[in-house]
């Protein structure tokens, strides 16, 4: 659009200027033959040049009707030529000088008047009625003879000289018929639409030669930076006969560079003023070297600037020697030259814009190829940098290219601090040539250490990779410049290296002798940290690097930085992967069971399943030693016929079981024994619950493996804790964090040498069993259970009996895994409450960590301060998760009813305990929940005159007797009955006399713990029993009532009295309940 706009403006401006060009020779009498070529110069020349007077011209042939006297156009009797004809009669106002139509001052005859404009049909030479029409030559003569003085009759437009006509190629011979105005317009059209800069410059020089009758011309284009401008000869010494190809080839073969201010063209470029020289050899600015080489003698020179629309110099045009016999370029030539170059400036700028767009497209293609190479070559830094340097050398046409890589680990602290203090310095990308000053010397004190140097020389030279030493870097000028760039982060463009070396007192080494220009730029990564320096040396044409080169190189450096950074990251990743592989090998060695353990387990006899109680839903591992747990696992695999069915080597199976046990951490609940209990429940569901008939052998294998591995490497914390602490596991797995980790650990063990129990499976079976294992382990996340539960319930409620579909089988296996994972809730009470204590302790440990590390209040079930609420929370857990699951499973598979019934029984026990806690009991500080009475408190609004506490330590045989004795003492009311001395010899007695409000809390600070050994040698359970006797002084005026527990006192046992009969009945019931407890 911009180019089209300029072309339209160009055409409009041409129309406005053409009229004034015709006025150059309005007074031919004042023109010398040298100044103006018209028919009055010489007979031969006039005859040769003017086709109207040529005898061979049909216009002058007597037989030609236009020149024949009998021709009515030339006949005196013809009214057009007759003096009496008003058109030719002097008295005719049209030809009368006094007639305003012919008066030069008349605007109708003014060259700028459109009525006299060559494009105006009244003044157009081609118009037969116009006196200047060549075909009307006789008419013009007749008019003159009849006294017509009109200036129009004397106008003779300038035409091409004979020499210029002879120089025209065949395709441009039509120009000889045009006068100067039409020729000017035609030559403007000739260049208006040309966008090839070479063709355009050639046309400009040829056309200027035609307009000014110049022998030859040259055109220079401005190049360089604002501080270093120079002219480059685009085309030089172009004549009318010089072909475009020859002119371009010669200009490129011998490139002529002229700095601004040097020579005639340089002065014109610097001053923007025209220079017209009559005698070139008498001007000191003229350089005669070209004449001496070519043998051509330059006489007259006309040199004029070419500016763009902003007035900036974009080139200089120069024409030499006149061809029409004139010794110099006159004012008319200067004016024509100036006007034509005005349009040429617009055309040159359009062509340059077009050339820039083409170059930009090519550069983008090169950058895209570079980007493609970067992403294709990311595993080898040397190959990548070699490709980058090759592309840079081809793009910017330089002789050599180097890349220095920085060792970031060796950066000095002061430099790092400077980067932190002034980060904007790393973002600055300014091009400047290093001049004087202390900046370079100051920056040498803060150096980055270069570790690798890549160098690429000529086109046929291979890349050189070296690791320069500090000594080599300190004695290399190029390395010193690279050090400066890496330290400051600035782009450096040195136009004259030798001058720079002198200014900075650097020692000239051999590599500097052949260096004249250097472009050096930092290479940064995504964090704007300098990771290297790219250095270009010497433009191929000997010129300094331009501003355009800097811009291109900056984009190139960005791609270079991305490629090097990515490749370095890839190499680091490869190193980390190698380290990880070594670490996994070490981990695998230490995580795998030893050979001695494997051989021992392999040789141990394996008892029958009944001896381990594997078929029962009441299985417990409390009585099993660690080796027995491994044997029990082996027996389950044998009973399911998995060893022979899938050809599992027995020693591999033994090693795998021992390795799985070894990879469980010694946390309080989620340990190896929990995994054993889950696997045993699955085994019981398959065998006793008869669910194996719905499973394939491969699925049974996968489910047993998943049960044993479902909590591998458990840390005693849940998924929420991993997320809150932003642990590496939470970063690695965003959902089901621990479950994904458990599966990965399972895979790691299977991949360890000698542990792959799936080694005999086919690829298809292997994929199938691993899919089962993964899905089953992930199903142990309760979040997954809640997602799948509704779909499973819907299938069961619809009476589904076919579980062979892939989705339905996945649902069923997921529900079975959850049922096995929480199966401790269905164990006998003596097992269940011990397991609940272990779970609570692990939860409380996590709650303590949350308080310590996160400074947050944990949820109730993990808050140690709310330990007495655990029975109530257990009831909620059963109601929300366990009972619905076991109920729906029993509805479909009635053989697993024991799980449902055991859960119901334990719910009643937990509910009972929860009610006791509400009455004032606490239990969590004990190892077991047997008789969890700990504290006793008085009740408000009552007076206690004498409260006596007796704390007695009992054994198991004394327990029931103590309970009955306590009940008896409570029934006696205020009698002070003491335990016999021989029954409390192992205990202690504390009597407290207290008067005052009953709301005062009185606690027993003394307690003894009895460890009852079930086998007579090892403590198994502990019991605290507080035996109390309350004696009250009877007041004659106030009735007394037995002490009752206070329902509003949580964790305490209180004594109270009431005068209300209704309250007495209610308290009596609570008293009875308390007595039953004791």
From Swiss-Prot:
GO terms for molecular function: 3',5'-cyclic-GMP phosphodiesterase activity; metal ion binding. A divalent metal cation 2 binds at residue 711. It is a lipid-anchor. Its EC number is 3.1.4.35. Binds 2 divalent metal cations per subunit. Site 1 may preferentially bind zinc ions, while site 2 has a preference for magnesium and/or manganese ions. InterPro entries: GAF, GAF-like_dom_sf, HD/PDEase_dom, PDEase, PDEase_catalytic_dom, PDEase_catalytic_dom_sf, PDEase_CS. Residues 65-135, 958-971, 1047-1065 have a biased composition (Low complexity). Has a role regulating cGMP transport in Malpighian tubule principal cells. This is cGMP-specific 3',5'-cyclic phosphodiesterase. It comes from Drosophila grimshawi (Hawaiian fruit fly).
